[in-house]
Amino acid sequence: MAAFAQYTLSTGWYFKDRDELASEAWMPVPVVPSVVHQDLQANGKLKNPYVGFNELDARWVNEKSWTYRKILQKPTVLAGSRIVLAFDGLDTFAKVKLDNNIILESSNMFQAYRVDVTKALDCGDEHVLEIEFDCAMLRAQELRKQDPNHNWASFNGDPARMSVRKAQYHWGWDWGPVLMTAGIWRAVRLEVYSTRLADLWTEINLDPTHKTASISAFTELESVDLDPSYKVKFTITLHGKQIAQAEATPQEGRAKVEFNIDQPCLWWPHGYGDSTLYEVSASLNADQLELHRVTKKIGIRTAEVVQRPDKHGKSFFFRINGVDIFCGGSCWIPADNLLPNISPQRYRKWIQLMVAGRQAMIRVWGGGCYEDDSFYEACDELGVLVWQDFMFGCGNYPTWPELLKSIEQEAIYNVRRLRHHPSIVVYVGNNEDYQVQEQAGLEYNYEDKNPENWLKTNFPARYIYEELLPSVVERCSPKTFYHPGSPWGDGKITSDPTVGDMHQWNVWHGTQEKYQIFDTLGGRFNSEFGMEAFPHLSTIEYFVENEKDKYPQSHVLDFHNKADGHERRIATYLVENLRTATDLETYIYLTQVVQAETMMFGYRGWRRQWGDERHCGGALLWQLNDCWPTISWAIVDYFLRPKPAYYAVARVLNPVAVGVRREHHDWSITHAQPPKTSKYELWVVSSLQKPASGKVELRFLSVDTGREIRERIVRENVDIVPNGTTNLITDGLIDHTVDAEPHVLAARLWVDGEIVARDVDWPQPFKYLDFADRGLEVKRVSEASDQQVFQISTEKPVKCLVFEERDGVKFSDSAMDIVPGDVQTVKVTGLRADEKLKYKFLGQ
């Protein structure tokens, strides 16, 4: 009887073009996991595809098949033990051979595979392990041809991609390149054991009073033979201290125990409480010998999606531990086109950025991958809620029996792998597949509840989203809410703002509405919306090699923006709102101002609507991140450099925030006339769970002089509604015949004597304003080894003061509006005392 042992097979690999027969064709692989693009670069056979036009020079890789090989040393094995090759991820069509005998053929990138090789390793100590990766691009095209009757309607990439269970963005998306990876993209191990714990999971019931919680812990055993002496000891620890222990004898390959926890420490999203994690361990023992131990971290919490009829239609919001949570956050795409590039440390930095930006939820988008364990662990530990799409995006997927079987296995594997993470609060069937159904005119009768009928329509993928996937979630993670698609709402048209979630793309795409009215375009939960912006100059300098190409309309910059019609759309929003410029640095800044303003107008209004009977339950911007250095909708670029929009969103999501806005006057319509009056509104939003009291001030400041043009408004002892909205002024009026000069509305909020929030509403559009001679002063007032403090003041209102983003330098705030009589403070870490703080503001 042998204890479990494992050997990670990360080194000693070689690879080659499968069709190359010469022995010298083999090249070393630095480390596994890897994909072929990384290994080709390491051997000097491929230029960095992220630089210049190198993506085009890498296209040949997409059409090749590859072979990986390793000499395998047989481990020491006790009698009665089993030897298993475990593959956590093979990308994608893989034929695994051991000593030239096929032991596995796989066709799903999202599954793990296990192969018993005990007998295969019987003879000899050295064995040849080979993995042939067939070309996924060509295989997809072949599969598509085999089903000409299927309607292959889709957005983005080759429609043939839908026939293959591989990350769909590898075929290219409107923010990323076409890089068809292949390889051992997740770990491969050799495991030796007589018995192992194949799974450990829990079912948690939290009493409504939160005073007690019951935890049922389960293990599943995989064994050569189930010895009657086997015992499984379960332990629960909190902060390193054991708080409970129980033992069980396996029955029919499973062991189960029950725990009752008094006064449990709950898991909360950040900003609402501690994200407490308990550690659950299971130890398999026989005759006092520990054979295998498995440990997982869990959180005690409840999570529900509240959908109930109301005056706005039907709600859609999240409730954690009985507390309603406004889910301000972002959508997440894979953080690299070459997935093994992403280290656990890099994942954590991304989630830390979310927390610092006060974002509560991240949506794992359905065209990427089920993320690495370290991603979800970071979300658990840092308190970020996860909206998890299944990996289907922008298409009408086929439903061949063998494909459905693979999809079911994929779903079971990943839901079982992820179900212990308290951060995951919803599984969603797909991204925008119902929108494809609508636009292509595919059959969808919501009233037909017979799944077999769905398979006979020209939209058979409905079977996946409304039958297959929900049944897997119900079996494997029954307390996690399932939503058929994003967007989706009770079978209604996906743009219906009264139900479910919606993707609002009529700013940027669609009708290209003014971003100033973004808040009027939302629904019950806005799970996608966005505006493009250039990344910082240092990022552009990474992929633009020649100085002569460093201008806004250069070919290489166009090439790195994959969005359809991107130049026209960016130009539209720039020309309508700002005085344009042609030098690259200013142009970059102007696009970032537009993105920041767009995100602010959307978030600010939708968060206010949270207080109106949960009219808006959340907003997830598109997108947080990039998969390569590019120009996109990301608010933080590939190198984790925040754009101004990141800071604008963080301010709007402050636990207590003040908002002020005047009604939008559209100057772009035919025969537009100056308004004689304008209405304005003033409000406070709070995510605090208890009432608070504050003071609110509203000043009216001339853009040209900085002077107050009318008497300020001050409200003392304002009772701030908890977890809602406090409307202070809903019928304010600006008389332009009296207050004719352009002026800002500058609001401040004090709580307990400290300024906790600001908001500034500006005359629109900015291009009509004169920003000359602002009298801005940025003064260093203190410095320490790890932090410097700057005070910022101005004589006249300043719009969007942005500090230069540098690696290793962090700002407590940026993209700030500064007004006279309101000195603001910014803390900077990572900046040397002898370094100059560089910045830019509108009109500079």
From Swiss-Prot:
Q: InterPro entries annotated for this entry?
A: Beta-gal/glucu_dom_sf, Beta-mannosidase-like_N2, Beta-mannosidase_GH2, Galactose-bd-like_sf, Glyco_hydro_2_Ig-like, Glycoside_hydrolase_SF, Ig-like_fold, Mannosidase_ig
Instruction: Cite the entry's keywords alphabetically.
Output: Carbohydrate metabolism, Glycoprotein, Glycosidase, Hydrolase, Polysaccharide degradation
Q: Which Pfam families match?
A: Glyco_hydro_2, Glyco_hydro_2_N2, Mannosidase_ig
Q: What SUPFAM superfamilies does the database record attribute to this sequence? A: (Trans)glycosidases, beta-Galactosidase/glucuronidase domain, Galactose-binding domain-like
Glycan-linked positions = N723
- Where are the catalytic residues? E432 (proton donor)
Q: In which pathway does it act?
A: Glycan metabolism; N-glycan degradation
* EC number of the protein: 3.2.1.25
The family classification in the record reads:
Belongs to the glycosyl hydrolase 2 family. Beta-mannosidase B subfamily.
Misc. remarks from the entry: In contrast to clade A beta-mannosidases, which are likely secreted, clade B proteins appear to be intracellular.
What this chain does, per the entry, is described as: Exoglycosidase that cleaves the single beta-linked mannose residue from the non-reducing end of beta-mannosidic oligosaccharides of various complexity and length. Prefers mannobiose over mannotriose and has no activity against polymeric mannan. Is also severely restricted by galactosyl substitutions at the +1 subsite.
Task: Please state what the protein is called.
Answer: Beta-mannosidase B
